[in-house]
Structures are given as structure tokens and as C-alpha cells.
């Protein structure tokens, strides 16, 4: 993060004010103030680690993944009990993304479900959409298979299995 001296002074003052307003986190803010004042470039990087940027294309792709899961869940609910028995219902749960390698995607899913109120039927589970394993490539393969299905919102058990196994 490149900052002018004036920007560093403003940020330093903000950290000082935060340390006064939030005594429980005062040490954290004082440390951040010191990093900014002294210009420690390595540590300054940790100050902006949560600043991300997801392009419009990436946002739409994530929404497509979530919509695919919504369609699979709705399709499952429309199946007969006999056909439902052929589907592993656990695989209908949208797991999210890996926080270690796909943090921006996890945060976007959390934003969509919490702040925007979308997909309330998705179970956040204990991990709140942290799948704990990379999922982006898997979802892309699944999405390709789903898009090739003639009736995307009325899938049969065979089509669900094909999507799961993509």
C-alpha cells in the first residue's frame, strides 16, 4: 500500500483515536499506528490484507455457482421419494470456498447470504461457507455440466449425479 506522508499521518491519527475509543483493542491499534508512522512496508501489507477486489465477472460466476446449487436443491425436492433415494442429499449443500486460498470468494458468499439476504435456504454450518478445501475448479466443472442439462431447474437423479461427479 503506497501512502503519502499526509495519508500516513491521517491513518496514524485514526488508529490513535480507535485506541482511545476501543480500549479492548487498544494494543492492536497502537501497533498499527506504530507500523504506519514508521513506514514498515512488510507490516503495512497486513493492514490491507482484507482489502480485496472481485471483478464483476467473478461475482457473477459465484452467483452462478450458488444458483446452480439452488436449482439442484429445488430439483431434488420435486423428485419422487424413489428418485430422491438415489441422490446423496448431503451433496446438495453448498459448502462455499476455502478461506485459506479462496478468501475473497468466501467473503463474497458471506456478503450475499448475510448482508444481502440471498439464498437463505443455504446452511452456513459451523464453518460459515469455509469448505476448508479449494472448490473453485470443482464448481466450474459442475457449472459446465449443469448448463448442458436441458431443464436446469427440473433435474432428474441421473443429472444430479452427473453434476456432482463433474
From Swiss-Prot:
State the disulfide connectivity.
Answer: none
Q: Where is the signal peptide?
A: none
Q: Name one Pfam family in it.
A: YfbU
Gene3D superfamilies, sorted: Helix hairpin bin, yfbu gene product, domain 2
Would you identify the family this protein belongs to, as annotated?
Belongs to the UPF0304 family.
Q: What is this protein called?
A: UPF0304 protein VFMJ11_1926
Q: Which organism is it from?
A: Aliivibrio fischeri (strain MJ11)
Amino acid at each position: 500500500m503506497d501512502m503519502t506522508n499526509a495519508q500516513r499521518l491521517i491513518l496514524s491519527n485514526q488508529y490513535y483515536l480507535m485506541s482511545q475509543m476501543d480500549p479492548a483493542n487498544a494494543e492492536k491499534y497502537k501497533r498499527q499506528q506504530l507500523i504506519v508512522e514508521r513506514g514498515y512496508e512488510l507490516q503495512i501489507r497486513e493492514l490491507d490484507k482484507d482489502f480485496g477486489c472481485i471483478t464483476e465477472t467473478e461475482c457473477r460466476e459465484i452467483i452462478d455457482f450458488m444458483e446452480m446449487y439452488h436449482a439442484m436443491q429445488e430439483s431434488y425436492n420435486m423428485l419422487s421419494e424413489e428418485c430422491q433415494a438415489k441422490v446423496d442429499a448431503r451433496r446438495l449443500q453448498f459448502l462455499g470456498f476455502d478461506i485459506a486460498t479462496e478468501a475473497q470468494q468466501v467473503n463474497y458468499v458471506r456478503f450475499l447470504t448475510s448482508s444481502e439476504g440471498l439464498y437463505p435456504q443455504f446452511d452456513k454450518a459451523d464453518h460459515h461457507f469455509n469448505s476448508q478445501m479449494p472448490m473453485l475448479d470443482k464448481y466450474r466443472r459442475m457449472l459446465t455440466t449443469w448448463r448442458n442439462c436441458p431443464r436446469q431447474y427440473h433435474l432428474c437423479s441421473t443429472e444430479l449425479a452427473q453434476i456432482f461427479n463433474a
